[in-house]
Amino acid sequence: MSSGANITYASRKRRKPVQKTVKPIPAEGIKSNPSKRHRDRLNTELDRLASLLPFPQDVINKLDKLSVLRLSVSYLRAKSFFDVALKSTPADRNGGQDQCRAQIRDWQNLQEGEFLLQALNGFVLVVTADALVFYASSTIQDYLGFQQSDVIHQSVYELIHTEDRAEFQRQLHWALNPSQCTDSAQGVDEAHGPPQAAVYYTPDQLPPENASFMERCFRCRLRCLLDNSSGFLAMNFQGRLKYLHGQNKKGKDGALLPPQLALFAIATPLQPPSILEIRTKNFIFRTKHKLDFTPIGCDAKGQLILGYTEVELCTRGSGYQFIHAADMLHCAESHIRMIKTGESGMTVFRLLAKHSRWRWVQSNARLIYRNGRPDYIIATQRPLTDEEGREHLQKRSMSLPFMFATGEAVLYEISSPFSPIMDPLPIRTKSNTSRKDWAPQSTPSKDSFHPSSLMSALIQQDESIYLCPPSSPAPLDSHFLMGSVSKCGSWQDSFAATGSEAALKHEQIGHAQDVNLALSGGPSELFPDNKNNDLYSIMRDLGIDFEDIRSMQNEEFFRTDSTAAAAGEVDFKDIDITDEILTYVQDSLNNSTLLNSACQQQPVTQHLSCMLQERLQLEQQQQLQQPPPQALEPQQQLCQMVCPQQDLGPKHTQINGTFASWNPTPPVSFNCPQQELKHYQIFSSLQGTAQEFPYKPEVDSVPYTQNFAPCNQPLLPEHSKSVQLDFPGRDFEPSLHPTTSNLDFVSCLQVPENQSHGINSQSAMVSPQAYYAGAMSMYQCQPGPQRTPVDQTQYGSEIPGSQAFLSKVQSRGVFNETYSSDLSSIGHAAQTTGHLHHLAEARPLPDITPGGFL
């Protein structure tokens, strides 16, 4: 076999001829060149002969003179074969068969053979004994990339791989032994295959045509322009050897040679195609480009698929104008790879067809060399469906930091892709050579960039090709959506102004009902002019239509309605982490403690009423004594400490009860306005007579407590020389002393643990978290039944005189009196333990000097 340097394969050898123009006949008397006249007549005859060939006009226009002659001879030989093969018998020449022949001619007009070729997974190939392609069907282009006119009457060895040429020659011989031929051995070593066989067989030397060993089935590799890996495609040949009639060949002596055997086979790809390849194999088209991808030619199928004529395709400039903006960089990467390696590989992108339609194609481009230099590009495209294109787009590996298709880089909504400093310099011409006229243009135009650049191709594209026509029956209007947004903004403004959550919910429900009523009118009333609306196009691309908007509005309405119905339930999103979680825990502890202390409230109440009656008698005896004149000062100081608590905001805890204002003889109620409990429902049960208090004190845990006795007298008894006092709830100035909670005056009466009367110990209300060493809770109040004025109690000091009291305070140092450290927290009464004694002489409150409150 010859070396690899002498091996050549089939390639496109055709070149586009110069367009022929009809020249006028010269006038008489003017001399003309006889050889030129001869060439002109020859060209005219060749053009007329080419027009008779059974090929499309675009193929005929690209044929050279030798190709026209070659195809003409091949056509005549094929016609001779069919004339002999289909020749009827002498019995058929009777007149009775003429009508059947006429019907056959009518059936032939249906082009049934073309449909059979399309349904066939392969192409038909007829090869003579001297290895010339006698016939190849037009479907060879779908598998090998060669057109029918490229291979007919050419050597078949130009298509076969060098390692498979010997096997193909063996299959052409009827006995599978081509070595019997004298000159066949040297033929395979030649560059273009073996020469014409020197031995011809007579029918007596050959077996019958229908013999079983005349069948052939073998495999070999054929040259393929569509393959992107090896350049060869493994094909399976299945057929038989048959006589090739009507060739009328003559031998060296001039004698007519008998018909010789030829291989009639069907070549199918060894790897079966997929369903999609079977469906789209007949739509493969090819385009020819310059090295900068400017199209310079397109075949008939490409014009049919894209809708352009060859003139329209070749006069637009850069081929990137026909590529989608999201695929330009991807195609440019394949273009650079093709320039470096000679082949681009399979590239999937979108091509712009006529009437602003995008077609997904799978393309493979190759460099074609001439004289050792790249000359042009041949690109083979196979149309894809939209589903296949989207699948390839998802699999595409994006090496760039952004992607055009997702909207991250807007190409058509900006005035300039560069900053003013980076504006490209204009091309200086004769008209702007002067300095005063020369200035950089800030606005990019088609002339601002290189004609073959990607940016120039993007600017030259029309923006309308990326706008999809509206097709949804329920369009959207921007005015409607903007109105919804404005109404949503008004909801937020009203909510910020009122601060009421219920008002917000009511407003949302009302608005949702109005929108649903508006939507019930139909799209024709809401969206009269919106077919060309950009917002509508965007919503249509997102798959949102009229029914989706209606369902979203209904969803919002039902969600708001259910929220309003469940307003009394606890919403964990509204819980304040710093304050209300502690309140929730405290409520849980209260509920567990109240169950244990409920059984003890009734005997305590009865015992307290007896003690209050005894205390009332003692206080009436003290009314006769003369009170000291400075008794009013501590009373006023105590009231000033209480009054600032009346100005607390609605966030703080309020007691669902009423206090008595202080009058001299009959106790007058302390009218505190009852406010709604917004967040805290801890003391909502303080309306009954048997009040439940949350905490039980620990015995012997308090170092010191004062003994006091409850009474049924007013809180501040009036003395003989004092005037009546009435303390309004909000007319006092704030005191400089630490403020206390209102709950200090609603503390329960404390009962000792071990008492001779047999009364069970009752827990007092626990105070909050801080202790103050300089103040004492002097009064405790218990709410009466059915919102009646509470009975007031008075502390009685066991040590006579204020100085003794102060000395005891200073000696002990620590009291169990507690006050709230934060106004936002809930105040409680002081926790005390000890024994109650019936005092013989109880000193009134004015004996306590103000020094105890410093």
Swiss-Prot record:
Instruction: List each copy of the bHLH domain by range.
Output: 26-79
Could you tell me the superkingdom of the organism this chain comes from?
Answer: Eukaryota
Which positions are cleaved off as the propeptide during maturation?
1-9
Report the subcellular localization: Cytoplasm; Nucleus
| Keyword vocabulary terms for this entry | Activator, ADP-ribosylation, Biological rhythms, Cell cycle, Cytoplasm, DNA-binding, Nucleus, Receptor, Repeat, Repressor, Transcription, Transcription regulation
Enumerate the residue ranges of region (DNA-binding). Answer: 37-65
**Location (main, coarse):** cytoplasm
Chain ranges for the short sequence motif Nuclear localization signal 1 as given in the UniProt record: 12-15
> What positions does the domain PAS occupy?
111-175, 270-340
User: Which intervals of the chain are annotated as region Disordered?
Assistant: 1-38, 425-452
Residue ranges annotated as motif Nuclear export signal: 63-71
According to its UniProt record, how is this protein modified after translation? Mono-ADP-ribosylated, leading to inhibit transcription activator activity of AHR.
Motif Nuclear localization signal 2 per record, residues: 36-41
Q: What is known of its domains?
A: The PAS 1 domain is essential for dimerization and also required for AHR:ARNT heterodimerization.
Q: How does it assemble?
A: Homodimer. Heterodimer; efficient DNA binding requires dimerization with another bHLH protein. Interacts with ARNT; the heterodimer ARNT:AHR binds to core DNA sequence 5'-TGCGTG-3' within the dioxin response element (DRE) of target gene promoters and activates their transcription. Binds MYBBP1A. Interacts with coactivators including SRC-1, RIP140 and NOCA7, and with the corepressor SMRT. Interacts with NEDD8 and IVNS1ABP. Interacts with BMAL1. Interacts with HSP90AB1. Interacts with TIPARP; leading to mono-ADP-ribosylation of AHR and subsequent inhibition of AHR.
Instruction: Please explain the role this protein plays, according to its UniProt record.
Output: Ligand-activated transcription factor that enables cells to adapt to changing conditions by sensing compounds from the environment, diet, microbiome and cellular metabolism, and which plays important roles in development, immunity and cancer. Upon ligand binding, translocates into the nucleus, where it heterodimerizes with ARNT and induces transcription by binding to xenobiotic response elements (XRE). Regulates a variety of biological processes, including angiogenesis, hematopoiesis, drug and lipid metabolism, cell motility and immune modulation.
Q: What is this protein called?
A: Aryl hydrocarbon receptor
- Organism the protein comes from: Mus spretus (Western Mediterranean mouse)
